[in-house]
Amino acid sequence: MGKKSAEKTELVIVTGLSGAGKSRAVDALEDIGFFCVDNMPPKLIPTFVKLIFNSNEKRDRVAIVADIRLGDSFSDIFGVLDELKEDEINYKILFIDADNDVIMRRYQETRRKHPLADEFNTPSILEAIQKEREILLPARLQADYIVDTSNVTSSQFKERIAKLFLDNASSSLKIYSISFGFK
């Protein structure tokens, strides 16, 4: 793989608790120019990254979401991260977290089922959240950034993500004006 491509591309692995705000994080990353892929099986990440690096299309910023929805294959993420390090591919891990009460409230508001509810026969959302915390603990410990969404608004969360991943040079306001005439 071309080392220059790997050095130029910013790779972010997004993970965290279900209901904590990973989808909003992806939206925020897309808004600041990231190419985002959600729910990618970890074993596909090295191949995908190599394709991105060797592509003719310019992809300077890539974010990949890998989380518990992948079931047992999520545990492959740690071997994959080691493989990326061996290939000298730099990446950052963004872990999205929230308090149990906040996540429970979000699930009750959306009336969605927690991804682990069926897998572990947990009738309680709280039990599913606690089990997910156990499973994700190694990822949280390796995270470069941990963002807690418990007490922030959507716009504050988006701002935090932007501050983490925008450098001073690119944080200035850019205005593009495009016009055309038709006769």
Report the location of each language-model feature.
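Switch/connector loops and helix/strand junctions flanking conserved nucleotide-binding motifs
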Residues: D72-F74, N100-Y107, L116, S155-Q156
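The conserved Walker
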Residues: S18
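Conserved glycine(s) of the Walker
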Residues: G21
